[in-house]
Amino acid sequence: AWPAIYAALGSVYVNGFPVIEGLLNAVHLDHLIELEVSEDELLKHTGERIELTSWADDYFESASGRVVTIHVTHTAQDGTLLANETERFAIRGRAYSDALPPEAPDYGGIEAEIESTPRRLLRRVKVVAPHEMTAFARTSGDFNPIHTSHRGAAVSGLAAPLVHGMWLSATAQYAVQALDEKGAHYEIAGWTYNMYGMVQLDDEVEISIERVGRVAHAGMVLEVTSRIDEILAADQGA
């Protein structure tokens, strides 16, 4: 989806000039996705071409920079709406307000009655981040040079490229959905991913999956936390 996301991001103008001057200026704040079909229905479209439609809301000023919200719909060839996606970016160096950006909707924005439960650890795994990000860039379409180029990373004051934030999101989702030794797994209907830190190449990341609530009449509410020495990302799934 990333070519469509970046195209929408580049469509936002301020006083006749693009709001983004380059990908190195864009800080990815959060990622939301809500499935509109079941996992079984989604798998029926494996191998098909998926049509993406993207657009941007008007920017708003915040203490984090100018915040731009991008929306993407994922539609199958037969017209079935598969998923709604939302991405938010802050444009660095353009902070004209002391207001904090509003928090992203929980659980991918799904509308459901949710009840809190005692917190319970369901899974904990450790993964090692890739040694370099070219393969993920080719798969996702996200060729932001801060992730794929040592020179691009150096322009941002970094010693080496950073791991894609969306690599960690995908890895956390896989940890939730993977089969355990008993053949059990969890199906994700909505997902909110908030990023709080950077993952370096070859970092070892601990991913903890906890139940924190339940959806009325069906399903659980999960909180997924990724950390090295501190919390790097917090995910909410339902």
Which residues does each predicted region cover?
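Hot-dog-fold acyl-thioester-processing enzymes
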Residues: 1-30, 96, 100, 105-107, ...
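Catalytic-pocket segment enriched in acidic/His residues
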Residues: 153-206, 210-221, 226-231
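HotDog/MaoC-like acyl-thioester-processing domains
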Residues: 29-124, 199-238
